[in-house]
């Protein structure tokens, strides 16, 4: 592990410089619906309160990854290390030559006028990240209700990232939403207890709802077996039987929060998982192309 900085905040690893070759034909118009941009911190400093300090992973590095993987469109999700200043994400979206859309972090002083302006600049939703890794294990329900109403007016989505033990308490809120809800990283349900564990049963129930979308992202974060993530495949198959038209794929680049370089996932390995998640080419096309294009109105 790298030494902590003067504030005692541990630095985490950056992404791999190279990626494994892709094992299947990437369809034209493929999307990566979950990526982050960090820095450069000389221009976009990190929030003082943060769980770790990642190295700069600027837009240019991600665009190079898109070229290597054959991805055409992406969704830049605002990272917690940048706090409530969404500038880094908005800048990336605006400089991406219309290849990226943005998901921002909401806060209590935001106004509807501000959000309406951000829609013209490529933003398409907000994200509530309240898992313990991000320093908070509770949802700000008052802010959620306010943003829910505004997102409904703007035709935006709400991304949610939480610990799996929060699923049961969130059921009514998610089920009652009137705007698309995207659950990140398989709901963070870890694979060790199998597909019959209660959190995954709850996730499957939520996946039956027409406004609930599931990101098949973060396989490296929920797997107990590690590369090639065999234990994640049954979870993806179970979800594809329920919601084939509301599954999304994302890289989660640059994979923040890893302190051991040996655990840093390979972006090629993660994309190759799609062929195992969806052996059927038509389903694969839905996950990579049709579903995100429909959700984000790019059809």
Swiss-Prot record:
Pfam families: Amidohydro_2. GO terms for molecular function: 4-sulfomuconolactone hydrolase activity. Keywords: Hydrolase. Its cofactor is Zn(2+). Optimum pH is between 7 and 7.5. Approximately 30% of the maximal activities are still detected at pH 5 and pH 9. Involved in the degradation of 4-sulfocatechol which is a central intermediate in the degradation of substituted sulfonated benzenes. Catalyzes the hydrolytical desulfonation of 4-sulfomuconolactone to yield maleylacetate. Belongs to the metallo-dependent hydrolases superfamily. Sulfomuconolactone hydrolase family. Monomer. This is 4-sulfomuconolactone hydrolase. It comes from Rhizobium radiobacter (Agrobacterium tumefaciens). The lineage of its organism: Bacteria, Pseudomonadati, Pseudomonadota, Alphaproteobacteria, Hyphomicrobiales.
């Amino acid at each position: 592990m790298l030494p902590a900085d003067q504030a005692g905040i541990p630095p985490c690893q950056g992404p791999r410089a190279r990626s494994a070759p892709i094992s299947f034909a990437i369809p034209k118009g493929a999307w990566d619906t979950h990526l982050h941009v960090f820095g450069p911190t000389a221009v976009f400093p990190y929030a003082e309160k943060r769980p770790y300090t990642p190295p700069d992973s600027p837009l240019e590095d991600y665009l190079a990854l898109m070229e290597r993987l054959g991805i055409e469109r992406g969704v830049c999700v605002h990272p917690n290390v940048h706090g409530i200043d969404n500038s880094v994400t908005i800048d990336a979206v605006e400089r991406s030559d219309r290849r990226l859309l943005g998901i921002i972090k909401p806060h209590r002083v935001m106004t509807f006028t501000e959000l309406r302006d951000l829609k013209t600049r490529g933003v398409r939703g907000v994200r509530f990240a309240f898992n313990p890794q991000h320093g908070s294990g509770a949802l700000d329900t008052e802010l959620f209700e306010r943003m829910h109403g505004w997102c409904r007016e703007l035709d935006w989505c709400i991304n949610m990232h939480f610990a799996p033990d929060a699923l049961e308490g969130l059921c009514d809120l998610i089920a009652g939403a009137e705007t698309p809800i995207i659950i990140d990283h398989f709901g963070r349900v870890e694979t060790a207890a199998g597909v019959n564990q209660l959190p995954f049963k709850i996730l499957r129930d939520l996946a039956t709802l027409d406004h609930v979308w599931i990101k098949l992202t973060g396989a490296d974060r929920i797997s107990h077996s590690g590369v090639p993530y065999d234990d994640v495949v049954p979870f993806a198959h179970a979800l594809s039987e329920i919601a084939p038209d509301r599954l999304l794929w994302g890289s989660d680049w640059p994979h923040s929060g890893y302190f051991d370089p040996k655990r840093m996932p390979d972006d090629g390995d993660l994309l190759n998982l799609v062929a195992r998640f969806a052996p059927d080419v038509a389903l694969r096309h839905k996950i990579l192309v049709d579903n995100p294009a429909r959700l984000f109105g790019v059809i």
